[in-house]
């Protein structure tokens, strides 16, 4: 198990890249092989001075390997920041719902939380915040901003969130993603 991933990683490093983008590198692998592949990516990244960007839905992998995380919704960054902050103190309503949907270890009687509604088609993203049709906080923002204006990434605690709940004034609407 994991031999294909190892071969692809080796081929990628042969070109001496500054960045490796690993899209779901551990999907369909058992936990022990998954850990080996992640450790290999980290080790080779350090040895070769190569940055590794993981694209994954597995928050466990993110928690174990990444320094920073960008949570995306409908093709846009909803929240970005240090992994521990985003996981333990999420600021965007989508990130809050996402973290709440992760089952607790050992609590078999707990009902899994879910985010009501469904993702929009990427060809039909709603005006304003793409999450607004599903957001439980949409009415907490004055002036219908969530449904009319797309928010930029706004300071939100130790992260940045694309959410009008964190706007201090109207001028904060269009900030850029930090490097």
Label each region the model flagged.
Residues 16-17, 21-25, 29-111:
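P-loop NTP-binding/switch modules centered on Walker-like glycine-rich loops
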Residues 80-179:
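Short catalytic/signature loops enriched in Gly
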Residues 1-5:
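ABC ATPase nucleotide-binding domain "signature motif"
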Residues 9, 38-40, 147:
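Short amphipathic alpha-helical "recognition" segments used for binding
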């Amino acid at each position: 198990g994991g031999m294909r991933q190892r071969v692809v990683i080796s081929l990628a490093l042969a070109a001496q890249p500054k960045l490796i983008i690993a899209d779901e590198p551990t999907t369909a692998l058992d936990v022990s092989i998954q850990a080996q592949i992640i450790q290999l990516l980290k080790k080779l990244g350090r040895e070769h001075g190569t940055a590794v960007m993981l694209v994954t839905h597995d928050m466990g992998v993110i928690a174990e390997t990444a320094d920073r995380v960008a949570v995306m919704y409908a093709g846009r960054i909803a929240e970005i920041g240090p992994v521990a902050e985003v996981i333990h103190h999420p600021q965007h309503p989508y990130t809050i719902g996402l973290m709440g949907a992760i089952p607790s270890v050992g609590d078999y009687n707990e009902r899994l939380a879910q985010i009501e509604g469904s993702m929009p088609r990427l060809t039909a993203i709603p005006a304003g915040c793409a999450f607004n049709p599903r957001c439980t906080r949409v009415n907490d923002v004055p002036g219908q901003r969530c449904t009319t204006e797309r928010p930029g990434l706004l300071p939100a605690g130790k992260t940045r969130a694309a959410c009008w709940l964190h706007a201090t004034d109207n001028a904060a609407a269009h900030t850029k993603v930090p490097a």
